Regions:
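Helix-loop-helix connectors at the membrane interface of multi-pass transporters/channels
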Residues: 1, 78, 105-128, 161, ...
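Hydrophobic alpha-helical segments of multi-pass membrane transport proteins
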Residues: 162-165, 295, 345-373, 409-429
Length: 444
């Protein structure tokens, strides 16, 4: 069934969207945090996490190539496991996007404060956050093509300062700073890998927009492989430069800005801070694009109120869903109640990853949509089993407080789901009763 959405995103625009969301704000802070946890073994943690995400991305590439509709992992879970599991996947993804959006808005304001201190507090802060949400909402309302083109521009704009940082920084690296000390504990190394999932994640959100891709069965595998390969190289080189240039990386609050000061002087932090603003804005645009399509996809399946599935007659975008997400994102951004959700961002993503990896052998066995699939993972069944096991390893290594927060989110989601289903069934029953009554009026 056609969803009524315009298929305006090509494979290279999808590559840009994926790079934009993967090379996001996480790399602006995490090089120092990971270095503090495992020292120079942070490079090994980067490589291990990249391999893990690479295997998971292969599963996404095959599963994603079987579908052309909107929903991404939500759609995959519905086909493989049923409506309830699909709702939970979609619900967790949506909450994660809202919380992630609000978090990045705060980071945006903080970096803007480097140039304009008044932006960090008071009415000025409120006005900036509101204006930022309004601009992004307008971009997404006008059309997905405009949103994708905006992502193209900001992908190039934010990669330029990062590439300059890498090229210039490589000439100032001190090999002595890569000396390995005593190996970290297994728990510390696992914690570092767990945190780095945040750096490499986000690609699953973009796949929600498959219903607006041209030839999604071919575009998804191509874009995932190209974008994540590019992101891995960029992120690993950034960590290498930070370690090799900055003596006290572990205690740096702005590692890229501090490192750039070493080899670029005062201009370095200014360039990096400006690049950070560009990076964050681009990532916010991608999150807004993906976040608004999740309620749309779930509403088309009668798991959320049906108005969220309406498509604007002129712009062919889900305007009710966009406005709803914008209002929720603005509220959370201004009130700060999103903080608890930040703690569960990684664990909810890992749960989503596990569901898609587990769906691969099920869809293969059912031969679901094999006529449209254009990509098949070599040794796909063993790879999917390994990925599910890795996800389980990451989940059990998380803190108990994160597990508690995820449980709260799951319970809240199930309540919303149950209420929506009850209301939907009531309307369906009323419609059947009305039809029956109308029919009896014609019987003597």
């Amino acid at each position: 069934m056609s969803e009524g959405l315009s298929r305006e995103i090509g494979k290279w625009e999808l590559v840009a969207l994926l790079i934009n969301v993967t090379v996001g704000a996480g790399i602006l802070k995490l090089p120092a945090d990971v270095q503090k946890t495992v020292g120079n073994y942070s490079l090994l943690a980067f490589v291990v996490c990249a391999l893990i995400i690479g295997l998971i991305a292969l599963c996404f590439a095959e599963v994603g190539s079987r579908f052309s509709g909107t929903g991404g992992p939500y759609l995959y879970a519905r086909e493989a496991f049923g409506a309830t599991s699909a709702f939970l996947v979609g619900w967790l993804m949506w909450l994660t996007r809202l919380a992630g959006f609000a978090t990045l808005v705060q980071v945006f304001v903080a970096y803007l404060g480097y140039f304009w201190p008044a932006a960090e507090s008071g009415l000025t802060r409120t006005a900036i956050i509101t204006g930022l949400v309004v601009v992004l909402t307008g971009i997404n309302l006008i059309g997905v093509k405009q949103s994708a083109r905006t992502s193209d521009v900001f992908t190039v704009s934010k990669l330029i300062p990062l590439i300059l940082f890498i090229i210039a920084g490589l000439f100032f690296i001190s090999p002595a700073r890569f000396t390995l000390t005593s190996a970290p504990s297994f728990g510390s190394f696992t914690s570092a890998v767990f945190v780095l999932v945040y750096v490499f994640s986000g690609f699953e959100a973009v796949l929600v927009n498959s219903g607006e891709l041209r030839q999604p069965q071919r575009a998804i595998p191509f874009a995932l492989i190209v974008a994540l390969s590019t992101a891995v190289v960029v992120l690993l080189l950034i960590q290498i430069v930070c370690i090799g240039v900055l003596p006290d990386l572990a205690n740096s609050q702005r590692p890229l800005a501090d490192a750039s000061f070493v080899f670029l002087g005062r201009a370095g932090p200014l360039v990096i801070s400006a690049g950070a603003l560009i990076s964050i804005f681009g990532t916010l645009n991608v999150i807004m694009l993906a976040c608004t399509r999740l309620p749309f996809a779930m509403a088309t399946q009668h798991q959320l109120p049906t108005p969220l599935a309406r498509v604007h007659k002129r712009f062919r975008t889900p305007h009710i869903s966009i406005l709803t997400c914008a209002a929720a994102a603005l509220l959370i951004s201004l009130t700060g109640t999103f903080i608890y959700a930040v703690k569960i961002t990684v664990i909810t993503r890992v749960m989503v990853y596990a569901s898609t990896c587990a769906a691969l052998p099920i869809l293969r066995r059912r031969k679901a949509f094999t006529e449209t699939s254009s990509f098949k993972v070599p040794a796909g069944i063993p790879v999917s089993i390994i990925c599910v096991a890795i996800c389980f390893w990451l989940l059990v290594s998380s803190d108990w407080r994160e597990a508690r927060d995820v449980s709260i989110a799951i319970v809240a989601g199930l309540i919303v789901y149950a209420l929506t289903r009850i209301m939907s069934n009531s309307r369906r029953g009323a419609a059947i009763k009305e039809t029956s009554t109308d029919y009896n009026d014609y019987v003597d």
